[in-house]
Swiss-Prot record:
Its main location: nucleus. Keywords: mRNA processing, mRNA splicing, Nucleus, Ribonucleoprotein, Ribosome biogenesis, RNA-binding, rRNA processing, Spliceosome. InterPro entries: eL8/uL1-like (IPR050257), H/ACA_rnp_Nhp2-like (IPR002415), Ribosomal_eL30-like_sf (IPR029064), Ribosomal_eL8-like_CS (IPR004037), Ribosomal_eL8/eL30/eS12/Gad45 (IPR004038), Ribosomal_eL8/Nhp2 (IPR018492). Gene3D superfamilies: 3.30.1330.30. CDD domains: SNU13. This is 13 kDa ribonucleoprotein-associated protein. The lineage of its organism: Eukaryota, Fungi, Dikarya, Basidiomycota, Agaricomycotina.
Length: 127
């Protein structure tokens, strides 16, 4: 593994935000508000049910997730890169690495406050 994250992976979350996002992803998985994988994330963006997108910076080649930031900017959805695909896979509750995930909207809204807090943090990174 390379020590330096890919420079194309912008914005990259710091350690505190990474932990906050991974915790929220675990809860979103519990409430069935999580889609795993680049293709599923693309579908949620196109359907307009996406709260925010998480991608990983250690994807090889990085180009397989770089279509997502463009879509996010078109749809006005916040997005962020995390350092580790293995950690994202664990948070998603699967045994394999996950390169992208999408937290989706839900009528029940148990996670609304946490989702809004994370979206605000991500938007601060994008400025």
């Amino acid at each position: 593994m390379s020590a330096q994250p890919n420079p194309k992976a912008f914005p990259l979350a710091n350690a505190q935000l990474t932990n906050q996002i991974l915790d929220l992803i675990q809860q979103a998985q519990h409430y069935k508000q999580l889609k795993k994988g680049a293709n599923e994330a693309t579908k949620t963006l196109n359907r307009g049910i996406c709260e925010f997108i998480v991608m990983t910076a250690d994807v090889e080649p990085i180009e397989i997730v770089l279509h997502l930031p463009l879509l996010c900017e078109d749809k006005n959805v916040p997005y962020v890169f995390l350092p580790s695909k293995t950690a994202l896979g664990r948070a998603c509750g699967v045994s394999r690495p996950v390169i992208a995930a999408s937290v989706t909207t839900n009528e029940a809204r148990e996670l609304n406050a946490q989702i809004q807090a994370v979206k605000n943090e991500i938007e601060k990174l994008l400025i």
